[in-house]
Amino acid sequence: MQRGIVWVVDDDSSIRWVLERALAGAGLTCTTFENGAEVLEALASKTPDVLLSDIRMPGMDGLALLKQIKQRHPMLPVIIMTAHSDLDAAVSAYQQGAFDYLPKPFDIDEAVALVERAISHYQEQQQPRNVQLNGPTTDIIGEAPAMQDVFRIIGRLSRSSISVLINGESGTGKELVAHALHRHSPRAKAPFIALNMAAIPKDLIESELFGHEKGAFTGANTIRQGRFEQADGGTLFLDEIGDMPLDVQTRLLRVLADGQFYRVGGYAPVKVDVRIIAATHQNLEQRVQEGKFREDLFHRLNVIRVHLPPLRERREDIPRLARHFLQVAARELGVEAKLLHPETEAALTRLAWPGNVRQLENTCRWLTVMAAGQEVLIQDLPGELFESTVAESTSQMQPDSWATLLAQWADRALRSGHQNLLSEAQPELERTLLTTALRHTQGHKQEAARLLGWGRNTLTRKLKELGME
């Protein structure tokens, strides 16, 4: 690959400076621009190998610039940069033909590697895709790197109808991602039908999926369409697919292979065109090894895998998510949105959140109703949040260990709004150790100092500081 020519457009001079030097250091020729109008003017006489553009700029923004570039130079790869990391920005960039999406703050080495990949792509004369779809906004929020990967996958699948398997713990937002995949796909105007395998009695799953004929079983008084027929032309979301019985897995596999099925009690085949998005919190590979999930069905579903991280692995997103959920809850209840005190925001970020995003959302609803003031303080938070965090942090400890008791004390103190816990705890810890050591040595100070790992002078000073002389 020949060394390439890179143009950078950003109204932030510091970003231009950093990228210009990093790209020059990689042997690339870099020219910077302050706004989109300057880029379009320069494009009238020459063309780079790749363009990096900020998305939020005065005047012409990055998406408007991208649209004009794709009309004039459809083969030119454009990388969109933004500090506003959300799904709609990523999808809009991909749908309008962006080569890739680079959220700020970015790792400079990764940015250079992405530019070099785009140059290679351009020099190989590969035509990038250009799709004009403007899907509705969603409630998927995330600036964490793992969520940016999810946004990229949704953007890259915006012209596709292939099967997707979503993995993630309960409450991580798997159905939201499934909705987003549907909304940003060619099937967006067709139905999106969801079915949770774990919520349906096993003997009713076949009827729910495939429908039934009149008289197929006791109580089947009319013909009933199943979820496959309801989703014809659109998307069928099968949540908790790992709980699907093996016999139903066999029928599902046939539908995926043939595009047709029989209603329960029926003899005429029903043809459908349905995209399958499946989700699970289980390890399907392990279920396959245990003989509880068909391997051939697993491979049919696992064309594209999307992993949703638990909330504890994307703590930087918690404040923004909490503010969003407080605003949503306020709109639902017709009240003014609560505000988070900075200490409360920090406390939320430290919590365990075993229920993930769903638990955070429910907590924000609870706070909207139950918090006394307009500003949410630490003492307004429900106690079970701290109990679950303490339980998680002490799960590896003995139930009667001093560390467990210390963790429980710290939990109570934080809930009461205490600060500077170390300055409060350390004197008590030293007083307890001194008292115990002196009792053990029948008041012999030199021996007590030895047991504590102190010199005699240190012990004497500590006794004085703690008022124990």
Swiss-Prot record:
Every Sigma-54 factor interaction domain range: 140-369
InterPro entries for the chain: AAA+_ATPase, CheY-like_superfamily, Homeodomain-like_sf, HTH_Fis, P-loop_NTPase, Sig_transdc_resp-reg_receiver, Sigma_54_int, Sigma_54_int_dom_ATP-bd_1
Record: residues binding ATP: 168-175, 231-240
Gene Ontology biological-process entries: nitrogen fixation; positive regulation of DNA-templated transcription; regulation of nitrogen utilization
Keywords in alphabetical order: Activator, ATP-binding, Cytoplasm, DNA-binding, Nitrogen fixation, Nucleotide-binding, Phosphoprotein, Repressor, Transcription, Transcription regulation, Two-component regulatory system
DNA-binding region of this protein: 445-464
Any one Gene Ontology molecular-function term assigned to this protein's record: DNA-binding transcription activator activity
Chief site of localization: cytoplasm
Name listed for the protein in its UniProt record: DNA-binding transcriptional regulator NtrC
